[in-house]
Amino acid sequence: MTNLPSFFVPFVGLILPAIAMASLSLHIQKNKIF
């Protein structure tokens, strides 16, 4: 259980910006199409 935060925090720190970037790029692509 002690190793969980040291693995979980960088994982979330990498995954959340990746999801934000992906949704942002999809939003920009939709705006370019319409």
From Swiss-Prot:
Protein's membrane topology: Single-pass membrane protein
Q: Which Pfam families match?
A: PSI_8 (PF00796)
One GO BP annotation is: photosynthesis
Give the UniProt keywords, A-Z: Chloroplast, Membrane, Photosynthesis, Photosystem I, Plastid, Thylakoid, Transmembrane, Transmembrane helix
Q: Any stretches that span the bilayer, and where are they?
A: 4-26
Cellular localization per UniProt: Plastid, Chloroplast thylakoid membrane
The answer to whether UniProt assigns keyword Membrane to this entry is yes
Q: Which positions carry the signal peptide feature in this UniProt record?
A: none
Asked whether the keyword Transcription is assigned, the reply is: no
Q: Which cysteines are joined by disulfide bonds?
A: none
Q: Which InterPro entries does the UniProt record give?
A: PSI_PsaI, PSI_PsaI_sf
- Name the GO cellular-component terms: chloroplast thylakoid membrane; photosystem I
Described by its record, this protein's role is as follows: May help in the organization of the PsaL subunit.
Q: Which HAMAP family match?
A: PSI_PsaI
Q: Which family does it belong to?
A: Belongs to the PsaI family.
Supply the name of the protein: Photosystem I reaction center subunit VIII
In which organism is this protein found? Castanea sativa
- Show the taxonomic lineage: Eukaryota, Viridiplantae, Streptophyta, Embryophyta, Tracheophyta
Give the gene symbol: psaI
